[in-house]
Regions:
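Bacterial N-terminal signal peptides
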Residues: 14-26
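Sec/Tat signal peptide C-region and signal peptidase I cleavage site
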Residues: 27-31
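Pocket-lining segment of extracytoplasmic ligand-binding domains
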Residues: 97, 175-260
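Secondary-structure end/capping motifs
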Residues: 226-304
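Conserved C-terminal helix/tail region of periplasmic/extracytoplasmic solute-binding proteins
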Residues: 297-330
Length: 330
């Protein structure tokens, strides 16, 4: 009888210890050990236009959705989209015109989100340039043909009546194009911020009244079809990153300083861009797509689908974005 009592006491003691272990080391520690899907995510510029994915990465928004994201900088939107088409990356935030041009040529990719609804860039010139017509025959620095800087430069030149009258020179990436301007290899540069301390703003592209998304978040059709939850996680984390930028300024300034360091300027300047241009609800707007189609001479009905706002619209309908800005749980 005593032996039975001792045995029962031992069992109770073991049971109590087991319960204590469970409470001391809760289930979330085991959840954290679960394998996360590895994602390669390309971004195409060292620019505050990319800050949404930087903040999503730094704040852990991707990880909370089971995604281990490796951000890959590829200098120029056209090259980033080539990497997506070639299967080197799972997702890319790159030049909207490069995404649309690739789709029109048959690339099996689709845009699922964007970042701006107007061109948050300006035409910066050397101090001696006083009027737009002085750019006739002059050189303008861009990253690469097919990039956002290339496309917006052409938009501005068309508006100014200078299309085909100025030379566009490729320098490679955003930093390289800035250096080209500072070393006076170019008289002008279209960029989201001043390419150098002596640069003077001649035209603010945002004031031209042109609907335009600077970048589109694109994935392959195959990945979207086979891994819809992963794509939704990417988009939701990206939207959360934008919200965090706008609602947690001290943290946002640190992230901007970290990623924008190569280009100079102050974190406050970059933050002003974020709050002014990045859309809280980053839908792909048909009018912005139409701007690109007009520039590339595309008319008539399209044979392929360029964008799908299904994920963003669903997140809006579920109140996800509202909660982010009201301090609720995502």
């Amino acid at each position: 009888m005593n032996e039975t009592r001792v045995r029962c006491q031992d069992i109770l003691r073991i049971y109590s210890i087991a319960l204590a272990i469970i409470f001391l080391f809760p289930l979330h520690t085991h959840t954290a050990e679960l394998p996360k899907e590895k994602i390669s995510f390309a971004y195409a510029a060292i620019s505050p236009t990319m800050a949404g994915i930087w903040m999503a990465k730094e704040s852990g928004a991707f990880e909370r959705r089971g995604l281990s994201v490796d951000l890959v900088y590829i200098s120029a939107g056209s090259v980033a989209i080539q990497a997506l088409v070639g299967g080197s990356v799972h997702a890319a935030l790159g030049a909207s015109n490069a995404v649309i041009a690739a789709i029109l040529k048959g690339a099996p990719i689709i845009a699922v989100s964007s970042n701006t609804s107007r061109p948050g860039m300006a035409l910066w010139v050397q101090p001696e340039i006083q009027r737009p017509e002085q750019l006739h025959g002059k050189t303008l620095a861009i990253t690469r043909f097919g990039s956002t800087s290339d496309f917006v430069t052409r938009l501005i030149l068309r508006k100014l009546g200078l299309e085909g009258k100025s030379e566009l020179r490729q320098f490679g990436g955003t930093v390289e194009a800035d250096l080209g301007f500072r070393s006076r290899q170019a008289e002008g540069r279209v960029s989201s911020q001043a390419p150098g301390p002596q640069a003077k703003m001649l035209v603010d592209a945002a004031e031209l009244g042109i609907p335009f998304s600077m970048n589109l978040l694109a994935v392959s059709n195959d990945y979207y079809r086979k891994s819809p939850k992963s794509v939704e996680g990417i988009v939701a984390a990206y939207i959360e990153g934008i919200a965090a930028l706008k609602t947690r300024k001290p943290e946002a300034l640190k992230v901007l300083a970290k990623y924008m360091g190569q280009r100079g300027g102050t974190a406050e300047m970059h933050y002003e861009f974020v709050t002014k241009y990045l859309e809280s609800v980053p839908r792909v707007e048909p009018a912005a797509v139409e701007t690109v189609l007009e520039m590339v001479g595309q008319s008539g009905p399209l044979k392929t689908k360029i964008f799908d706002n299904g994920i963003v619209d669903r997140l809006v309908h579920e109140g996800f974005i509202d909660r982010l800005y009201k301090g609720g749980k995502s």
